[in-house]
Amino acid sequence: MEKYCTKLNEKTDEVLLSVKKAAKSISDMVAKTAGPFGSNVMLINGPNCRITKDGITVLRYIVEPETEADKIALSVIRSASDETNRKAGDGTTATCILANEIFQQGYQFLTAGLNGNLLRNGIVKASGIAQKMVVDSLSTPIKDDKDIYNVAKISANGSDEIAQILTDVFSKIGKDGMARVELSNTDKTTSKIVYGMNIDRGLESPYFATNEHGEAVLDNPVILLINKRLSVLGELLEPFKLLAKLNRPILVVAEGYDPDILNTLVLNKIRGLPICAILAPNYGEDRTKMMEDLAIVTGGKVISPQTGLTLESIISDQSILGTAKQVIVNGESTSIIADTSVIDKERLDKRVAEIDHVLEDETLNDHDKRIAKTRKARLVSGIGIISVGGATEAEMHEKKDLVDDAFASVSSSLKKGMCPGAGLTYLAIHDALYEWLTKHIAELSQEEASGFRIFADSLTKPFLTICGNSGNQNTQYALGCIQNTNRSEHGQDSELKPWTKCVDFSSGELVDVIERGIVDSAAAVIETMKNGASAGAQLLSLSGWVSTPPKPQVQQQM
């Protein structure tokens, strides 16, 4: 029974103080990387060393925290930054900074006797209002290649090379396009476009992943397209015996999976069968059309009641199976790099012409028009392949991190727009939140209002960090100057507008950040505030921990 024993630390003040110190230590390390003048961090793992300026990479590299407090702070902050990275591709350092600042400021209120859960309510409320401000007033859509270049350059830490490559790639794959980032065999970074299709469906289970990045990479797979829910285990047995004999990876695309079916597929994957399952794209009639599109791209056929094909049909007719050169599946989406030798060009052209004919219908509603445009884009666009080169393996890995983040940042910006960078958007929201609080203070309790102020005041920290990393010794003075400049420009205007005036930290001159191309992805700003607030509030509500004691080491007798 000893291995199930737990230890409860009931001294709340000691718990919070130790976690507070741990969170600050973690944040200080990550914050060094913020902004154009941020420092690199050396990651050392035995004889292997790696240099990075990527906040989330630093967080992921801390694998053995020394104390329970370190583990708690790291787990909460890293989870928040991971979520920001997954949704926006950028803003991970800002998420870490914001989460820690909320915790540090909130700690002072806790020691004064305020209720942590009510503080949390105020923090979360302020975060929700702030996110809406970005969507409603502070973001602008990406208009052209110049905007794409600027977003990519900021996310890639000022790399003109990466920004130009991504601009070229997105000009060819479109805003819904996908790209595969890989290491090159040379010192050059290059890109190319291959024919394929992207669908917004990811791994049905993380157990299907084949690499450390949580992706399933299937080379020359067989593809099974099933426009119905898989619910009868017996239907799979004979067809899958045949598929296993082909000695090729298997991608299953189906409307849905009963738990028993999915568990069986996962179990077979664990036992060595190279299989991956995803959901079919979209719903209803739209799903039927998209499955037929997939059949054209993969050279296969759709199994469904409408086509009259069943799983057993595979045994006598293997032409039902589709294929591809490669399929990459992550948690969110699937990229199919087509094997053009199996595509019926006449069938493909006819399909695109059918969609064009549908789009000519002036009575088409907005939903059907959007679906038709998406289908056409997926049928005619390609997939970007970016091969990252460098003089050393360490340089290649560092550059690949930047390309991954910049691609995701541009992709999210094309969907949600961009905002002024350099921390200015957070400063504009800071003022707007205080204006909101002045009008609605009666609606909040004392603790909730304090939590609201904690979040608002914490929004100045990203700017202060970027400013400090540039070598400025008086960051508070710089903050005051920038706030006064932008407040004066907007005057008494009650409408919330983006702040755009900031000091160029390299030259010291006052500039318009939009004109200088200093921009952030709106999605990154939104996710930073959402996840930073969640993490900071989580830490504030902590009162103790339960831990399993380490197993005693058994000394071997000589």
Question: Each PLM stretch: what is its role?
Answer:
Residues V15-S18, A22, I26, G38, ...:
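Helical mechanochemical/support elements of P-loop NTPase systems and associated helical scaffolds
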Residues L17-V19, E64, A69-K71, I270, ...:
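Extended, low-charge hydrophobic alpha-helical regions
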Residues V19, G35, G89, G113, ...:
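Residue-level signature of catalytic and energy-coupling elements of molecular machines
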Residues V63-E64, G128-P420, W545-M558:
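Long, structured protein-protein interaction/assembly regions in large complexes
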Residues N85, G116-N117, N121, K125, ...:
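Metallocofactor- and cofactor-centric catalytic cores in central/energy metabolism, strongly enriched
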Residues N85-I97, T111, G116-L119, M133-D145:
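Short, flexible active-site-proximal loops enriched in glycine and acidic residues
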